[in-house]
From Swiss-Prot:
Cross-link entry Glycyl lysine isopeptide (Lys-Gly) (interchain with G-Cter in SUMO2), positions: K179, K262
Reported tissue expression: Expressed in heart, brain, placenta, lung, liver, skeletal muscle, kidney and pancreas.
Protein name (record): Serine/threonine-protein phosphatase 1 regulatory subunit 10
Modified residues (Omega-N-methylarginine): R665, R693, R738
Length: 940
């Protein structure tokens, strides 16, 4: 119309000649003119006006004329446009108009209007539009169902007329037509239900074969040759085969009941088109269970293979009811070839296939895929000449060859000579050299410019033109509600402060004092004299360095030694004066600047020199080789306990025997199995001899483990009662460490026990006990002895003995014993001996026994050091009773096993890697590995 706005009243005035008072179109000619005006309408007002005119028109002739002229296609265009632009009011008006028009199935096939309406009914956003589209779809479905029931009868009549012309040439034709007509008129519902029951009751191959034979037993009687084909065709519900067989059977005789039964599957399709679901749903059970049923029934595939030629045509014609006309055409071509009669029979086969297009229409409507071209062409082809069908079928199956001139094709392309040339190959060396010189110069300039970073302006700055922008049409945020929400929110919260500057300059410099970096020397020699290192000997006071000025750093070995000595009290010499540790260290180290500490440690005899100098001062006790004790032996540094504690709780002392671990269990730890553990019962030490199993010697002291006399497997006996008379039992004293008359006790390291008269005490190194008459003392010291007393000789010393006394001889010595006396075991042990007592022989020694002394029961010690004494099987372990008279032979103790003690000779063990790498070990004397020069001879 015009480009300006349209007034609907003016438009209606122009159309007044074609409309009556109610707005309805008067005549058929008027609707064609209105349609021509509708094609030119572009505005929504004019289109809605024309749609309302159509809604007011009631005459079906006028509406049909509008559809025939092309109004339905025009409405399709308007519907597509409004759907793409999502114009809801126009869509509603178009749907109302479509609902008002008398559309048929043929009209619906012309375009995709039905598809668009179906999509609107499912995916439209507007609820009213969705409801309107669904109502329109349901109305169209009702139209499709009603027309699908009426079309088969009309098309059958047309076919009968066409076939009636050829009745003269085909005498068999009237018989089949009469039978088909009578069957269609008698019972259409029965014919529709029977094939349905066949499909539903026999989903599997095996079942279907049995039921098919039961239902069609009379039909098998006249045709025995084709029994197998009958089963296959019935099973798949194939129509052309029964038709062909019926034509052969019906020629000799009239209509027989078997012939009628064979025809029943033929005409089920035209009658079944009234119910769409019956056609579409039944094949699903066959498809779903076909695989399992094929496994259950093996003979069916064999039948197919044998009768392949006969079964081929029905299988090709089988999908015709479901797929449409295209699949039936090749099947009809085969029966027409052998005889002149089959072309007419092919038309009979097409008769049930003609109503297929109406059946497909509702299916396409349901899936919103209505195609106008394919559905419209199929009903046109169905009444056509069968020769055209066969001709089309042959064209589809024919193989065409190209002409002679087109058999060969030539393709020409231009060859690029430089296509396969190696571009990396240097052709001209002079040019390559120039390029390399230029690249080097460029790289040099770039590096120089980047190093100095002198950037200069090469292009003068030109101020750009100011742009004059038009004022914005809409002020940003004019209708924003968020700014009010944020303003309300900021009223009740703290303001957010951002302290960073607005300018991108450098930040304010922070004041700080520059501190020179600390120089960490890589070589230790450089730092020897710069930073003095003070070695702290004791927590209370600091000991000076060896040179008096604190200039040198102690080696790790000496540092550990000084720390271990500083843990206990300061050692005292025999005269009671203190030992000057600084003098010892100065003599060991020599001048601090002469040799670095690392070089001193590398000397093989360095540790031996330290020991030789420290042993006479009493810092390390007896030497490791002199009496079999390790450095820091009984009462050594820190007085460490080197045996597993007993059940009653340990009380560390130099001897765990008499008066040793005091508690409820006074007898030390339980003995291990005879096999011995590798830690506490190691191999025999050649330097110290085998384990001693002697008489009533000392209990297990440091580095000793008491052993039982009965093989070591028996549990320890209950602690015996305390006896004070005549020395009591050598295994006990009172729990508080006080000895009775004649009793004795071995005091722990750092303890000073109170002793009664006649008692004896084995004292730890560095202590001087007060002894009463008859008292005795541990190794390494010369105690003051009363009459009848005895003393424990130090390593390499011969103690002075009183009458009736006994000594504990040092290692390698044969002590002289008085009459009735007893001798303590070697190695710094002092057994408690009363008059008439006995002795526990030292490991590997054969003691000299005086009169009245009884040797160990069953023990024959060896004279040569390094041998292991035999096991002593005497009274129970840790138990020997002191007798009053002489001649007592005690037993039941197992002495010190050689080669397994901590701090002893560990040369047969692996070397401690901590000691070798760092020069010291955190376990010190308790380490179970070999420290060369400390717990064994130095490495060669």
């Amino acid at each position: 119309m015009g480009s300006g706005p349209i007034d609907p009243k003016e438009l209606l005035k122009g159309l007044d000649s074609f409309l009556n008072r109610d707005g309805e179109v008067k005549s058929v000619d008027g609707i064609s003119k209105i349609f021509s005006l509708m094609k030119e309408a572009r505005k929504m007002v004019s289109r809605c006006t024309y749609l309302n005119i159509l809604l007011q028109t009631r005459s079906p002739e006028i509406l049909v004329k509008f559809i025939d002229v092309g109004g339905y296609k025009l409405l399709n265009n308007w519907l597509t446009y409004s759907k793409t632009t999502n114009n809801i009011p126009l869509l509603q008006q178009i749907l109302l108009t479509l609902q008002h028009l008398p559309l048929t199935v043929d009209h619906l096939k012309q375009n995709n209007t039905a598809k668009l309406v179906k999509q609107l009914s499912k995916s439209s956003e507007d609820e009213e539009l969705r409801k309107l589209a669904s109502v329109l779809v349901s109305d169209w479905m009702a139209v499709i169902r009603s027309q699908s029931s009426t079309q088969p009868a009309e098309k059958d009549k047309k076919k009968r007329k066409d076939e009636g012309k050829s009745r003269t040439t085909l005498p068999e034709r009237p018989l089949t037509e009469v039978k088909a007509e009578t069957r269609a008129e008698e019972a259409p519902e029965k014919k529709r239900e029977k094939p349905k029951s066949l499909r539903t009751t026999a989903p599997s191959h095996a079942k279907f074969r049995s039921t098919g034979l039961e239902l069609e037993t009379p039909s098998l009687v006249p045709v025995k040759k084709n029994a197998s084909t009958v089963v296959v065709s019935d099973k798949y519900n194939l129509k052309p085969i029964p038709l062909k067989r019926q034509s052969n059977v019906a020629a000799p005789g009239d209509a027989t009941p078997p012939a009628e039964k064979k025809y029943k599957p033929l005409n089920t399709t035209p009658n079944a088109t009234k119910e769409i679901k019956v056609k579409i749903i039944p094949p699903q059970p066959m498809e779903g269970l076909g695989f399992l049923d094929a496994l259950n029934s093996a003979p069916v595939p064999g039948i197919k293979i044998k009768k392949k030629k006969k079964v081929l045509s029905p299988t090709a014609a089988k999908p015709s009811p479901f797929e449409g006309k295209t699949s039936t055409e090749p099947s009809t071509a085969k029966p027409s070839s052998p005889e002149p009669a089959p072309p007419s029979e092919a038309m009979d086969a097409d008769r049930p296939g003609t109503p297929v297009p109406p059946v497909e229409v509702p299916e396409l409507m349901d899936t919103a895929s209505l195609e106008p071209g394919a559905l419209d062409a199929k009903p046109v082809e169905s009444p056509g000449d069968p020769n055209q069908l066969t001709r089309k079928g042959r064209k589809r199956k024919s193989v065409t060859w190209p002409e002679e001139g087109k058999l060969r094709e030539y393709f020409y392309f231009e060859l690029d000579e430089t296509e396969r040339v190696n571009v990396n190959k240097i052709k001209d060396f002079g040019e390559a050299a120039k390029r390399e010189i230029l690249s080097d110069r460029h790289a040099f300039e770039t590096a120089r410019r980047l190093s100095h970073d002198n950037m200069e302006e090469k292009v003068p700055w030109v101020c750009p033109r100011p742009l004059v922008l038009p004022s914005p049409l809409v002020t940003p945020g004019s209708n924003s509600q968020e700014r009010y929400i944020q303003a309300e929110r900021e009223k009740g919260i703290l303001q957010e402060l951002f302290l960073n500057k607005e300018s991108p300059h450098e930040p304010d410099p922070e004041p700080y004092e520059p501190i020179p970096p600390k120089l960490i020397p890589l070589d230790e020699e450089c730092s020897m004299d710069e930073t003095p290192y003070v070695e702290t000997l004791e927590p209370g006071g600091s000991g000076g360095s060896p040179d008096g000025a604190g200039g040198s750093k102690l080696p790790p070995v000496l540092a550990n030694l000084m720390g271990s000595m500083g843990a206990g009290k300061g050692p005292q010499g025999p005269g009671g004066g203190g030992i000057n540790v600084q003098e010892i260290l100065t003599s060991i180290m020599g001048s601090p600047n002469s040799h670095p500490s690392e070089e001193l440690l590398k000397q093989p005899d360095y540790s031996d020199k330290i020991k030789q100098m420290l042993v006479p001062h009493g810092l390390l006790g007896p030497g490791p080789i002199a009496n079999g004790f390790p450095p820091g032996g009984p009462g050594g540094p820190k007085g460490m306990q080197h045996f597993p504690p007993g059940p009653g709780g340990p009380m560390p002392g130099p001897h765990g025997g008499p008066g040793g671990p005091v508690g409820p269990r006074l007898l030390g730890p339980p003995p291990p199995p005879r096999g011995g553990d590798p830690f506490w019962d190691g191999p025999g030490d050649p330097m110290r001899g085998g384990p001693m199993r002697g008489g009533p010697g000392p209990g297990p002291g440091p580095y000793h483990r008491g052993r039982g006399g009965r093989g070591g497997n028996e549990p320890p006996p209950p602690p015996p009662p305390f006896r004070g008379a005549r020395g009591g039992r050598s295994g006990g004293g009172p729990p508080n460490g006080r000895g009775g008359p004649g009793g004795g006790m071995v005091g722990g390291g750092g303890h000073r026990p109170h002793e009664g008269p006649g008692g004896g005490m084995g004292n730890s190194s560095g202590h001087r006990p007060h002894e009463g008459p008859g008292g005795g003392m541990g190794s390494g010291h010369r105690p003051h002895e009363g009459p009848g007393g005895s003393m424990g000789g130090g390593g390499g010393h011969r103690p002075h003995e009183g009458p009736g006394g006994g000594i504990s001889g040092g290692s390698g010595h044969r002590p002289h014993e008085g009459p009735g006396g007893g001798m303590g075991a070697g190695g710094g042990h002092r057994p408690h001996e009363g008059p008439g007592g006995s002795m526990g022989g030292s490991g590997g020694h054969r003691p000299h026994e005086g009169p009245g002394h009884g040797g160990p029961h069953g023990h024959r010690p060896h004279d040569v050091p390094g041998h292991r004494g035999h096991d002593h099987r005497g009274p129970p372990p840790h138990e020997h009773r002191g007798h009053d008279g002489p001649g007592h032979g005690g037993g039941g103790h197992r002495g010190h096993d050689g080669g397994h003690s901590h701090g002893g000779d560990m040369s047969n063990r692996p070397v401690c890697r901590h000691f070798m790498m760092k020069g010291n070990c955190r376990y010190e004397n308790n380490c179970a590995f070999y420290h060369p020069g400390v717990n064994g001879p130095p490495l060669p």
